[in-house]
From Swiss-Prot:
Residues 1-14 have a biased composition (Acidic residues). It holds the Pfam family DciA. This is UPF0232 protein MSMEG_0004/MSMEI_0006. It comes from Mycolicibacterium smegmatis (strain ATCC 700084 / mc(2)155) (Mycobacterium smegmatis). Residues 1-81 are annotated as: Disordered. Belongs to the UPF0232 family. Residues 30-52 have a biased composition (Basic and acidic residues). InterPro entries: DciA-like, UPF0232_actinobac.
């Protein structure tokens, strides 16, 4: 009588490989445990996360039920957390803090620099610590260049040092009267008429 695996399986006379010398004295489950410990140690040395295998759902035994307790009047880890604090912790743990700070400069521009400046100037880009600010007129661009150090101090106070290192203040892009293939230089940018 033949089974379904008789034709495909290894031959009965094939030699079984001997265990290494340091495992030669172990048999059965002890050999398996020792081999598993060595495999886990090798995985840990490579920086891999080593678990205890799959665990099933937690079993509740009738006599060992633990009563749920209230958190009490003091602060506790189970208390509801503020959304801002949780997202800030998430950004720190994931290494997003620098990107979040850069985004907050542009997103909170009005709160950072004040209403008067925000009405006349908008941030357009922040690349490698250089914040590009576009003013609505050349007069406002000149005014912003004069108070540039105060603006950098305000930005550093709100979002932290090192996020914005320099300001690049540009005036508005003037209208172009250039038509055709050939061009003669004009009087310069004409963004304000008077």
């Amino acid at each position: 009588m033949t089974g379904p695996f008789d034709d495909d399986g290894p031959e009965e006379d094939a030699p079984v490989p001997a265990p290494p010398d340091h495992l030669a004295g172990l048999r059965g489950i002890d050999l398996v445990r020792r081999t598993l410990e060595e495999a886990r140690g090798a995985a840990r040395s490579q920086g891999k996360d080593v678990g205890r295998g799959r665990s099933g759902p937690a079993r509740r035994v009738g006599g060992n039920r633990r009563r749920r307790t209230w958190s009490g009047p003091g602060p506790d880890a189970r208390d509801p957390q503020l959304l801002g604090a949780v997202t800030q912790d998430l950004a720190k743990s994931r290494g997003w803090s620098a990107r979040v700070a850069e985004g907050s400069v542009i997103g909170r521009w009005r709160a950072v620099v004040g209403d008067q400046i925000a009405d006349h100037a908008t941030p357009t880009a922040l690349n490698e610590g250089v914040l590009t600010v576009t003013a609505e007129s050349t007069a406002w661009a000149t005014q912003l260049r004069m108070v540039q150090s105060q603006l950098l101090a305000k930005i550093a106070a709100v979002v932290g040092d090192g996020v914005v290192t320099t300001l690049k203040i540009v005036g508005p892009a003037g209208p172009s009267w250039r038509k055709g293939r050939y061009h003669v230089s004009g009087r310069g940018p004409r963004d304000t008429y008077g």
